């Protein structure tokens, strides 16, 4: 081989290695972004293979099933980048059908072109193909017809050009806005929806409805993430928020419901810089209630319980079933059993989540940085509807909390609801598995 040929061959080899390394980096970036978007949580059925779809999702008109997004021909195998982009950011699949808005493409419209390229590289070259056909929805005809979804998309979903990332004076807040309003699609759960099921706001610029809390879905409500002290994040520090997102627990609260999946599949893998950006952005959101005030601890109930006075409705149920972990003063045990005093979850206008936890229990998920799990047992088998209502009302109105009381009929409605039949033990197993 001549020297000239050797040089040419060496340059070609170096070029090949460079392309391969660049592609590997792009796939790795796409994997991180897929984590940020928590794609696996919706596109993986219980006991199924990652991203193969088939997870049932309750909607007001029936059950739909998530789709296969692996690079198999039954999934994304024949999707070009343009096809992929049209589905993710525009809500239109390869055959021209509009996706159900359970796919948060109105939020994904904010994802940048470069991040879309990385996501495509990951799903096409970094995900194991799984041959699994998509399942049809259980929505009855004529509600199952897709053409109304196209009209919905036209009326309510922003175009990519109309929905650019917000830019703030603080670049950390700008990054947080991009993650929360875009890939993180936090508003899909934490923003209320109109009768026509669109989110009432897609960004902070759209008004105070953004991230102000949702209506009940599958037995839970997604609480407000705005600056209110009573039922939002006003009393949380930036550091506490980062800790909560990374571990599922903090000095102030513990994760439950669908947010457990978010922590397990997504948030624990985010970089410290990105978690800080998310927390700082959320802390920048003002309160909804201009008269909102910080929680003022009231020790009257704690003193009464300490003296053995359980005359207040719900007090005896609390002493017998709750005080050992959450204490008579309502302060709980840091990062083990959450405090009830001043806890925003106890003071939301809708007590569905709290009733659900009492009935069905729950388990803190294990994460890389907080591997220990703690379980609250289910009390549905032990307490009557009236006893649950009494103890829920008791904790919502004690230690300075300002939550309204609930009734036995509120408990009965949730108990017999077919949306949440999982026992406390089953919930723990599901959470652990994911």
What are these regions (language model features)?
Residues 8-16:
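Bacterial N-terminal signal peptides
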Residues 347-348, 372:
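C-terminal soluble interaction/assembly domains
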Residues 38-44, 55-110, 114-115, 219-249, ...:
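The feature marks the first
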Residues 1-7:
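Bacterial N-terminal signal peptides that target proteins for export
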């Amino acid at each position: 081989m001549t020297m000239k040929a050797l040089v040419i061959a060496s340059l070609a080899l170096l070029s090949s290695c460079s392309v391969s390394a660049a592609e590997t980096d792009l796939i790795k970036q796409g994997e991180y972004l897929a984590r940020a978007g928590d794609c696996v949580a919706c596109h993986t059925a219980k006991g199924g293979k990652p991203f193969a779809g088939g997870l049932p999702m309750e909607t007001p008109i029936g059950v739909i099933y998530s789709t296969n997004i692996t690079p198999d021909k039954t999934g994304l195998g024949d999707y070009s980048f343009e096809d992929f982009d049209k589905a993710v950011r525009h809500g239109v699949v390869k055959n021209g059908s509009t996706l159900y808005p359970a796919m948060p493409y109105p939020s994904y419209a904010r994802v940048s072109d470069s991040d879309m390229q990385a996501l495509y590289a990951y799903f096409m070259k970094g995900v194991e193909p799984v041959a699994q056909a998509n399942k049809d929805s259980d929505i009855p005809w004529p509600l199952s017809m897709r053409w109304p979804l196209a009209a919905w998309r036209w009326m309510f979903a922003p175009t990519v050009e109309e929905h650019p990332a917000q830019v703030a004076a603080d670049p950390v807040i700008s990054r947080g806005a991009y993650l929360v309003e875009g890939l993180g699609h936090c508003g899909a759960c934490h923003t209320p929806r109109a009768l026509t099921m669109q989110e009432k706001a897609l960004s902070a610029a759209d008004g105070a409805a953004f991230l102000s809390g949702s209506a009940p879905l599958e037995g839970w409500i997604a609480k407000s993430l705005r600056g209110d002290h009573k039922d939002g994040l006003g009393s949380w520090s930036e550091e506490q928020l980062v800790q909560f997102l990374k571990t599922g627990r903090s000095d102030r609260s513990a994760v439950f419901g669908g947010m457990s999946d978010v922590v397990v599949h997504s948030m624990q893998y985010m970089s410290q810089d990105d978690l800080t950006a998310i927390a700082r952005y959320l802390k920048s959101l003002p309160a909804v209630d201009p008269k909102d005030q910080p929680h003022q601890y009231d020790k009257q109930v704690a003193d009464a319980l300490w003296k053995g006075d359980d005359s207040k409705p719900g007090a005896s149920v609390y002493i017998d079933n709750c005080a050992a972990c959450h204490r008579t003063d309502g302060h709980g045990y840091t990062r083990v059993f959450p405090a009830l005093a001043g806890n925003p979850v106890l003071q939301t206008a809708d007590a569905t989540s709290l009733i659900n936890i009492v009935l069905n229990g729950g388990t803190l998920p294990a994460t890389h940085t907080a591997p220990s799990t703690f379980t609250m047992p289910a009390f549905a088998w032990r307490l009557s509807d009236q006893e649950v209502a009494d103890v829920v009302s008791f904790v919502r109105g004690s230690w300075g909390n300002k939550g309204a009381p609930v009734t036995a009929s509120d408990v009965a409605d949730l108990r017999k609801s077919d949306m949440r039949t999982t026992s406390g033990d089953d919930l723990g197993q599901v959470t652990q598995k994911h």
